[in-house]
Amino acid sequence: MIVKPDKMIRVVLDTNVLVASVFYRSPFYWLWESFLQKEYELCVTSDILNEYAEVIERRFSINVAESALEQILSSPNIIQSTRYFEWNVIEKDPYDNKFFDCAVAANADFIVSEDKHFNILNRVTFPSVSAIRMEEFKQILQKNKKV
């Protein structure tokens, strides 16, 4: 995987990945903490933000959802994009196409997800967006810290 020390990495986080990372006792809290420490740029659309809020509220509470969204929206390393085209690449879960569309619109380097249906993206040649797992993204962030 290519590490880009000359620019901040741009990623789209699948909702399950983000939700797994926001609780400070989570083993995946490093992902949220890395965002707060501006180690990568998070690309979102209004659809993605709405889904984040809905799922965080369902899993935790409305207060946690509001706090997380406030932190995201006030961060300087947030890239708010608009979907201009629907690619419909992910057939197994069409609702997840919003993450691919956002990645294309924001020129993201990766989509971080644990869902296997995102693996199809690694076979799509145009537009090209790589899907990686959380552990792989963690390794990329660690390499960037050393550069």
Which ranges hold each PLM region?
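Acidic, PIN/NYN-like endoribonuclease modules and their adjacent C-terminal/linker elements
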Residues: 116-147
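A secondary-structure boundary/capping signal
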Residues: 14-15, 44-45, 114, 133
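Alpha-helix capping/helix-boundary segments
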Residues: 17-18, 48, 117-118
